[in-house]
Amino acid sequence: MRTPTSLDAVAEAHVDALASHNPLNATWCGLPGHDHELPDFSPEATGRWADELRRTLHLVREAPKVDEADEVTAAAMTERLGLELESIEAGDQLAAVNNIDSPIQWLRDIFDLMPTKTDSDWANVASRMAAMSEALDGYIESLREGISRGIVPARRAVVDAAAQAAALSGQDSRFRGLAAGSGRSGALRGELERAAGIAAEAFGNLGRFLTTELAPAARKADAVGRERYQRASREFLGARIDFDETYEWGVESLAAITAEQEALAREIAGSSATVADAIAQLNADPANLIHGTDALRDWMQRTADEAISALDGRYFTLDPRVRTIEGMIAPSATGGIYYTGPSADFSRPGRMWWSVPEGVTEFTTWQEKTTVHHEGVPGHHLQVGQAVAQAENLNRWRSLVCWVSGHGEGWALYAERLMDEFGFLNPGERLGMLDGQRLRATRVVLDLGVHLGKPAFDRYGGGIWDYDKCWQLLRDNVAMEENQLRFELHRYLGWAGQAPSYLIGQRIWEQIRDDANRRSGQDFDLRDFHDRALAVGSLPLDVLREVLAG
């Protein structure tokens, strides 16, 4: 066990400050003591947090660096906290509205992670729901300041968010459903019902504000522009990239993956078959179909458990606590698939969540096996779980709090490709993996293209990328149900920089591995590389590159 240093103490204090400033983060990380609270989203609270960031950055600079772990912590905290402060100073939080990752969804989805076994647990749920009005009032206050300063989200994102708020405000609000399904009685049941009414009313008020005040003031253009995109890209990658070179690489990658997929389609369905023909053949095979969410959950669990058994000790060295993962069906029904990490003590295991859209009852294993590898092992669960298991060697900021999308999502895509390289996919499942790769390459082209005003493909009429051209690009390259595909497009438009972090992150991970292979020559050991890379936790990718080159 490593002896904690003064810099670790700075990092630990920052975790405690973060838990108080944003209790949602405490719940996400499994930190106790804040499950009854909600954040203050007001401009005043954000200003206080900016002061805390400045203070912590000063302490990080001044603290002695006694070992390599300290050097890594200092580099990562300087990059992450410095960028967060830069974003606050630019006012990015004043336009934080989209359909997938903004205060609206954070406040909705946090209840999925809260314990609900005891009366005390349910009392926390009631307290959080009762605090919703104050939390959303602070959020509205920040959005109003954004209007006054001319920092506003796109109108399309506001319309989507207003629809989500409305869905949370009616008599069938999920908050009322929480209270009704609690199994509690007496005074606690009454408190849950009262709190659910407060939460539903608060979201109704938010929906009216979004519709009547923010939507008329919102910008018509979906694109955020290069200046905002610079910060967004760094937020999700932890690396500085050449946008123009990366866009051209994305175009080339999309073409290469498409050719690879087309060749495999001919192998599956005949010499003249298209990708659509191969997909139709795979979808028609009953062996590839799952009916109902219960069967989907069971298949997710079985597939994840099989991967853990096959990989542990051969390609990776799993901490025994990481061998447990749970497949879950999310109650939100929005169409996303995501992972939530274990709590600090592993009392809450890592979980794969499938948010199944309303009316979707049939699922295809050939297309989704790679998704389980992405969310489970060797993807997010291995990566996040191994970091949490390093708590005795890493401070809590490193093991629990620091999460960089390009590092995490890039690793998960890298993991998908590894499963193909290791021979775990049959031809149909490999087509599914390539389908996912094609989606991620499409995201690079679309996201950089629309937000930076890049020229659209001639086959879509030239000019610059806009909504209709982006939709056609997705329709031509992504095998996804139409409602979910529309949700994806709106996600990219409203959450700039996040979607391309997957494939760009994979690219950087592969560059780092190839660099290590060249340095080590015949002594290169893939399992050792993986173990070392995962042991340092999630890092900004520029920091990771330096660490693994050392």
Task: Go through the PLM ranges and name each one.
Residues 1-550:
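N-terminal maturation segment of proteins
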